[in-house]
């Protein structure tokens, strides 16, 4: 399993980090601020499964997501990891299948998707590789079927697509014979 490397983040002014169950936190959707007892929350919000296993932990600073967000499957395996700065995703975002295989890796820059984005099948085989620049496709974009066959392969340039996008065979080859659905 991977993990996001340590990053410098601003921490609450006091030495002890307040840990509060997420159900005790209140989100004001108009502001995007999380409150605890009427005040913007600074500390660690946590949630557990009914079996006591950790489900999620997220760091807040003055009511905003600021730091590492981690989620786990009920069996204790890591399922999701992301870093927030001032309520926006920033850096690498990773997710895993319940079998422990990497599911996806995305990159963000101040809340906007930016950089190489990868997705995998639960078997671990590649599914998609997308190149994104400031939230838009730019460069080589590829996707594979689970058997490894390439079915999307195009270049995105200035909002235009050049190449093969979602190619589907209308027939199957068995040996040297063409087999149709008749």
Predicted regions and their residues:
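Glycine/tyrosine- and acidic-biased, solvent-exposed loop/turn segments at the edges of beta-strands
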Residues: 1-182
């Amino acid at each position: 399993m991977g993990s996001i490397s340590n990053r410098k983040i601003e921490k609450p002014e006091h030495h002890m980090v307040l840990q509060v169950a997420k159900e005790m936190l209140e989100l004001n959707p108009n502001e995007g601020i999380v409150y605890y007892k009427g005040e913007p929350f600074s500390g660690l919000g946590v949630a557990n499964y009914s079996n006591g296993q950790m489900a999620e932990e997220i760091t807040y600073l003055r009511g905003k997501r600021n730091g590492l967000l981690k989620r786990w499957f009920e069996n204790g395996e890591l399922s999701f990891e992301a870093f927030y700065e001032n309520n926006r995703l920033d850096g690498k975002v990773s997710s895993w299948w319940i079998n422990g295989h990497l599911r996806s890796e995305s990159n963000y820059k101040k809340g906007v998707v930016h950089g190489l984005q990868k997705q995998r099948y639960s078997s671990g085989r590649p599914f998609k590789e997308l190149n994104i620049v400031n939230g838009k496709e730019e460069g080589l974009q590829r996707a594979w079927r689970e058997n490894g066959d390439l079915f999307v392969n195009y270049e995105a340039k200035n909002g235009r697509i050049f190449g093969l996008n979602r190619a589907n065979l209308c027939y199957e080859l068995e040996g040297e014979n063409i087999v149709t659905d008749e």
